[in-house]
């Protein structure tokens, strides 16, 4: 039984352990699956990254409202560092995020300017926490529009 039997497109499978580029953190929102995938392809990350998907992306990792989830992310990040020797973490939050509303309230996402500031603050906190726990990693953070346009923050 070959890959064609199952209608699968063959691809090069790398070893579970090795040297990979990054972990990509993104949101569970179904609207963001294709834009995030497209970004990864454009960044030449296909087959070179591990992925962690959680409601809110960085918000799910740092917001007190989701504190029970935090350990799962940090444990997974530690595992991908150990197994994949990643060099950086890429956190992609997105606009119109329901988890942001749950975590911070409607007023914190009431208009695009306020929404941007809310995400910038969460992404800055995420960057800070990664730096404290894993100072060897680079951290890239951004806010993606529903159309896939990504605004990066440093």
Residue ranges of each PLM-predicted region?
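Divalent-metal-activated hydrolytic enzyme cores
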Residues: 1-11, 16-22, 27-36, 57-73, ...
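Short Gly/aromatic-enriched secondary-structure transition segments
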Residues: 37-44
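A short beta-strand-loop structural module common to alpha/beta enzyme folds
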Residues: 47-57
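Donor-sugar nucleotide-binding helix/loop cap in glycosyltransferases
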Residues: 91
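Short, ordered loop/turn segments at secondary-structure junctions
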Residues: 94-96
